[in-house]
């Protein structure tokens, strides 16, 4: 019998992994010469998310949408939610973040990563001004609601009447929605019960 083709095939398969084996052999021999110490494995590289700025509140969805550049935003019927690209590696925080001082009570909407980014700077500043304006308007509206409109005039009476109608209409709509949900739930339960009875009968 001629074993030459079979031996040749086995040698070919065995020597295909020869370069890797040679490299591994040199590493092992070098490790044995150094006293058997293995080099520490390098920490895996994790991609950092590119952030244009950091928001002072994560509840501010507009700010989060503006600042986080690589988040895919998914529209759901309820709200817009971020569809993240893995957990980002976070930088260490200073003690100032844990113990806020009195000066940091009136913070900006966000803090830009680059000081030369004018669009970001304008966005953060405009957000602060808008929030201040909204809070002033809310305070004025609350003050008007609390006061008697006889002193403020006809416009105040009209606004109170419109606001009252709106709230009553919204309450009626929410009540009808709740009722329709309850009815649908009862119908679904009745259908399930009928289906179970029908299956048991046959």
Curated annotation (Swiss-Prot):
Q: List the disulfide bonds.
A: 53-67, 55-63
Q: Name one GO biological process term.
A: positive regulation of cell growth involved in cardiac muscle cell development
> What is the annotated signal peptide range for this record?
1-25
* Keyword match Disulfide bond: yes
Q: Which residues make up the pro-peptide? A: 26-50, 74-202
Q: Name one GO molecular function term.
A: endothelin A receptor binding
Top-level division of the source organism's lineage: Eukaryota
Which controlled-vocabulary keywords does the entry list? Cleavage on pair of basic residues, Disulfide bond, Secreted, Signal, Vasoactive, Vasoconstrictor
What are the site positions for Cleavage?
Answer: 73-74
Family named by the database record = Belongs to the endothelin/sarafotoxin family.
By what name is this protein known? Endothelin-1
What is the species listed in this Swiss-Prot or TrEMBL entry? Bos taurus
Name the gene.
EDN1
């Amino acid at each position: 019998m001629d074993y030459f083709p079979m031996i040749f095939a086995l040698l070919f398969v065995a020597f295909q992994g020869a370069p890797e084996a040679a490299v591994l052999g040199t590493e092992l021999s070098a490790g044995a010469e150094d006293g058997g110490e293995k080099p520490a494995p390098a920490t895996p590289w994790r991609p950092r998310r590119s952030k244009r700025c950091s928001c002072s509140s994560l509840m501010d969805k507009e700010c989060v949408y503006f600042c986080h550049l690589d988040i895919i935003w998914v529209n759901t019927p309820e709200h817009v939610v971020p569809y993240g690209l893995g957990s980002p590696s976070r930088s260490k925080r200073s003690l100032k973040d844990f113990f806020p001082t009195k000066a940091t009570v009136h913070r900006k909407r966000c803090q830009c990563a680059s000081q030369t980014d004018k669009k970001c700077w304008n966005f953060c500043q405009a957000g602060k001004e808008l929030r201040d304006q909204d809070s002033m308007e809310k305070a004025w509206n609350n003050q008007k609601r609390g006061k008697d409109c006889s002193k403020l005039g006809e416009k105040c009476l009209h606004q109170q009447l419109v606001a009252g109608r709106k709230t009553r209409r919204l309450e009626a709509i929410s009540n009808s929605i709740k009722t329709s949900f309850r009815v649908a739930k009862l119908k679904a339960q009745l259908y399930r019960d009928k289906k179970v009875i029908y299956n048991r009968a046959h």
